[in-house]
Amino acid sequence: MKSIRRICRRWGGIAAVAVAAGVVIGCGGREAAGRRVVVLGFDGLDYELTRELIAQGRMPNFQRLSERGTFAPLGTSIPPQSPVAWSNFITGLDPGGHGIFDFIHRDPKTMIPYLSTTKTEAGGRTLTFDEWQIPLSGGSVELLRRGRPFWEVLEDRGVETTIIRMPANFPPSGTATRELSGMGTPDVLGTYGTFSFYTSEPYAFGGRTLAGGVVHPVDVVGGVVRGAIEGPDNPFLVKPEKVRAGFTAYLDDQRKYVKLVVGDEERLLRVGEWSDWVPVEFELIPTQGLRAQCRFFLKSLYPYFELYASPPNIDPLAPAMPISTPADYAADLARATGRFYSQGMPEDTKSLKTGVLTAGEFLEQARIAGDENRKQFKYVLDRFDDGLLFYYFGNVDQVSHMMWRPMDPQHPAYDPEHDVQHAQVVEELYAGLDAIVGDTLARLGEDDLLVVMSDHGFTSWRRSFHLNSWLRDNGYLALLNPQRKDDPGFFGNVDWASTRAYALGLNGLYVNLKGREVPGAVDPGDRDALLAEIRERLLQTQDPATGAPAITKVYRREEVYTAADHEDIAPDLIVGYAKGTRGSDESALGGLPPEVIVDNTDPWNGDHCMDHEAVPGILLTNRALRKPAPTLQTLAGAILAEYGIDAFPTPRKD
């Protein structure tokens, strides 16, 4: 995922300003206005771990559901990546139909990678005078997922739907009665989340650039620190320049707390304390600004000043980009339950990966984000009288990425002294989801349906596979300078004229095909034989540390995708890594490290982008469904069958 965030920083740009120019089942529920269906989407909930915790008696509400209804593994997508998986669920289509194949796609005409679910277009013509330019048309943000979402079918039948934080649904589809966008929603910088860290320590982090964050040197002068929160480029300036909002921190004499002043806002923070949401306004021109919001964490005042600022989130009270349907629904939620993380993946995993926050500090930040979500869920559920409600929880997924290793003493980076204190973190989060299920059941009646599902499972990420390096070593990818075997990314040392195949994204492999890729080197007639050869050799590849296969499945897209509407962006092969092995972050963006398979020593230590059969999700219901749903792709159709709707997926109406 860190590679995905790098794309946001490099190619995301000015999206924001471009657009801105313990219960008994079925008892205790209140009287409902009509029959209700509640779908709880628990991202990354693993079937095996859930089953173990149920057997241990630690998830009593899940157990009651399993005894009354259904508890089964839910087949995930190929590949098992969240935007792909949730798109399968939303549309009832596989990637060949909905067009989302990975977190990362590439333009075969330029070979530039981009985020798969959203495209941002700046405004068109401008009026220029001196250093200023006035856009004569607004920008736009387009959802790239194709296919008809299941809730649109319900709305056409007169069933109101509320879709909260559905991944791969930014900007919101506009076809539900109420929507709030989720995973895929950027911060105002146009990234998936870029934090700021202000420090008076000279040469902090060795002067290196942090992945997913920016270090800002500051000075303490007379007990005062002055700094600035960075926003996006100002679209009204001919020469690009970032907008900034200044802040001042006044230190007390004992170095125990600061008074933080941001615009008209003041906050008193002690060391180790998080602020609430602080409104931030970036001035674009004297008559127009861009509103955002940040949370601050005062990490230290001695010996150095250290202040963390969250990514500047879209302000739900004045959204710079569309994040809800209707447009004022986000503001309604914020007024009712308080400001909240509008960023699609709010848990700041990058701050932990870079060492800006400790594990304990990260977990506190994740708890704050999770508490906001649970508070909002209670508000929405209390007002849900009829129709279908989908509500998404992503806390377990993001924390599992960072905290799976403490449960795995066999992980190569396992540290008994450090990890033992976090060994129960993930399991405690599972217990928290069990409590959410209990609260939901308490509000449902006898005729209501509860569906609990996850998009994929989870496991330990022990070994990293550099797929582009494997292609290099096996003669499929050529280098301009063969003596240089440490290309950091974006194919900077690739000799395209002699390259037959390359990898991009977490599971995709592409033929360098004439007529598709601009630097194409392989005749279309040679494609099939080349793919067969690469697949056979990949499946024979063993991990030198264990002697076991490193890759257990390799699919041709024609074998697993039913449509071929996206041949320009679809990978030719989808690689299913053995459980415990994942494609590397370096290879995902065109990097070619010297070795092929290495230990994963990254703080990001749990994952699911492997062989899809190794990481199924879960399906749990309070009664048997009328129609079976063995996979994510069939689940929405099974839910629609509860309403007497059998034909799904259906074509989108023009």
Enumerate the language-model features and the residues they cover:
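Bacterial N-terminal signal peptides that target proteins for export
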Residues: S3-A15
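C-terminal motif of bacterial Sec signal peptides marking the signal peptidase cleavage site
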Residues: I25-G26
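A long, amphipathic alpha-helix that forms part
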Residues: R30-A32, L49-T50, L363-L389, V399, ...
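Secreted, luminal/periplasmic, and some membrane-associated catalytic domains
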Residues: A33-R35, F42, Q56-G57, E67-P73, ...
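Structural motif
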Residues: V39, L388-Y392, V451, L620
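Second-shell loop/turn segments in exported
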Residues: D46-E52, G139-S140, L625
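A solvent-exposed, charged loop/short amphipathic helix patch at secondary-structure junctions
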Residues: R125-I134, A359, R405-Q424, P593-N600
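Low-complexity, glycine/alanine/valine/leucine- and proline-rich hydrophobic stretches
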Residues: A578-K627, L635
